[in-house]
Amino acid sequence: MIIKRFKQFKEKYGKEAFKKLNEFFQKEEKIFYENKIRELMESQGLSEQEAAIKARQSWVATIGGKLEKIVEILIEDFCKEYNLSITNDKVLKRNNLPKELDLVKRAILVDFGKYSLLPDGDIIIYKKTNGLPKIIAILSVKNSFRERYTETPYWKLKLLQSEITKDIKVMMITPDKDSQLPRPY
């Protein structure tokens, strides 16, 4: 339901939708809490306070995955306009990938000697050039900046160690709801 409502929200606000994300999330959080608290009180017989605590935990788990999809929706028009493709690390971890996605996977693998790992890549943007994917950017989408601020720079440093991956842009996308990032003046 959140994704469906976000698509309607994006239709309403168009290219300016990203500027109103906090407004969207606040409204969604309120709807989610009201429904979840009522559901937990009725189904599990919890007090309102106990249900509120569980509802908050449930919201955090729910919104994390939804945020990735919302960012994808926000950038899909841009990607179409510039003939870019999108995938993610969950897709790339699957077996028997189509050739194009297998090439994307191989283009971002970080070599640790005896093994290789995929960097944290909630959204991977690439362009097909002469039948081969050129990785443009890896986006790490985090609902909360706290305690995760080192993951994205770590992967960028690892990608810099190879001539093949050194030019890949690595970015973290966050609504920074905890106001952990300094604000520009």
Describe the function of each predicted region.
Residues N83, T129-K134:
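Short, solvent-exposed loop/turn segments that connect beta-strands within catalytic domains
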Residues I123-I125, I136-N143, T152:
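Conserved catalytic cores of phosphodiester-cleaving nucleases, focusing on short active-site segments
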Residues K142-R148, K177-Q180:
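Short acidic, S/G/P-rich loop/turn micro-motifs used as interaction or catalytic elements
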Residues K158-D167:
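Arginine/glycine-rich "motif VI" loop of SF2 helicases in the C-terminal RecA-like domain
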Residues R106-Y115, P119-G121:
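Aromatic/basic-lined ligand-recognition segments
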Residues Q161, P175-Y185:
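Domain-level recognition of nuclease-like catalytic cores that cleave nucleotide substrates
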Residues M1-S58:
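Nuclease-adjacent, charged terminal/linker segments that flank catalytic cores
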Residues G45-L109:
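Acidic-basic catalytic patches of nuclease active cores, encompassing PD-(D/E)XK
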